[in-house]
Each structure stands twice: as structure tokens, then as C-alpha cells.
Amino acid sequence: MRARSSPASRLTSAREPPFFLPRRCPSRCSRGALRRRLTQRWGGRRPDLYIDYTKALLRPDFAVSAQNCWTGKGGAFTGQITAEMIKDVGLGWVLIGHSECRHTIGKGEDNAMCAAKVKYAQDAGLNVIFAVGEKKEERVGGTTEAVVAEQMKALLDAGVTGFGEGLVIAYEPVWAIGTGLVATPDQAQEAHVFIRKWIAENVSAEAAEATRIQYGGSAKPGNAAELAAQPDVDGLLIGGASLTPGFIDCINAFKCKF
């Protein structure tokens, strides 16, 4: 996990991201890397029904995030929640673009819809964790970078800003989510380097250095330390492993990056 201006990982609070884990900073680290490290905190995303309950149990330095939001303020969209509702219950973060929203639920959310949600959430004053990643056939076909680049480009097309500030990127290879498979540390680092390079080339070098990039694909206690050792893995977007006592081991694995 890197230090940015907000928290990170599965729990989040009013100006900080969900479950973020720290980032290793070598003895001589860049100004952006140092900034990322100094601003990291802990956070987590909770189902909407349990937000108040979760907030009541946590210390103030833990941030709580919603898991999704709709694309606008209102309308006939039964079952959806708006960014304004999220803010109204005291949250400062929302997760957008998770693979299950993109590929599993209903007709799925395409790149344009996910990006529109990010823009709307930002305009409402929320920080965003934006998930990107490729499916198995795209990984096998060698199009991982092209797929991720299109997902990132949609943000700029929608007028999204905040790279290095209230926008966190979470790389989650779809083929590794809930499957027991996991990208190797080298594969995770490679993807994170590509994302950081993309931001440098399309936004700015400063934004690239300051942007937190999490890894989320069957991250668990058994691989957390190896992932933490990668210089561009700034934190973890943890799913199933966050429901077990071993979750604390994932947190401890990233203490080297504080």
C-alpha cells in the first residue's frame, strides 16, 4: 500500500479509502511514494444494511465505504442507492467497478457506466476506489494491458479527476477473484506498473506517483507478504479472506510499508 491523501482496503471513512494496506518505502523513496505512505489508513467496505452497525464497532481511524452507487441522484431505480445517500450516513468512500458488477450481476456495467458512476460520486464529494482487471480469456490472449487501458480511459472520457487524491485504483484480475487462483507477485507488480505508467502518460507523472493502486484477487494471509514486497502494490482489496481471523495477518504483512 502506498501513502496517498486517504485510506485504503476494505474499510473506509469520510476522507479515506477502504481496506488499504501499507507500502514498503525504501530508504530513498520518491516524494510521491513518501506522501502515499504517510496518508495511508485502514478501511473496509460493508453491505449497506450493516453500515451503521459497522461504524459503531470501529475506531474513528477506520474508514467505512459503500460497495456501489447509482449513476445519478434519483429516478425509478428501485433498490439502488445514490452518492448523496452514502454521504448522508457519514461515509466518504465508495467502491465502483467491481468485477461482479461488471460481469456477473444482471446485464453488467460497462466501462462507460462505471466511469459515469465515478464522476457522479466525485461530484457528490465522495472518494472512490475504482476496480479494473481482465478476464481469464483476456489474460490468456495477451490483452490484459489493452483491457485495463480501456477501463482507465473511460474515466478520462467521463471527466474524472482526483488521481493521486481521492481516487484509488484497485487491480483485480477477474480470473483470480473467489477462484483460489491468484496472480503471482510478479504478475501483480507488472499490472500495477502498467497502470502507474498509464496514469503518468495520460494524466501526469505527479499523479502517477501519488495514486494508490491496490491488488484484489484472492488476496489472503498466505500471499499477503509476497504482495506487500512488490514496490507498486500499495494495498489489498480483500474479499473472502476479510471474513476470517487470518485477516489480521494481511494487515500485519503490510506494516513494512507504513
Language-model segments: residues:
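Active-site loop-to-helix "anion-binding N-cap" substructures in soluble metabolic enzymes
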Residues: 1-258
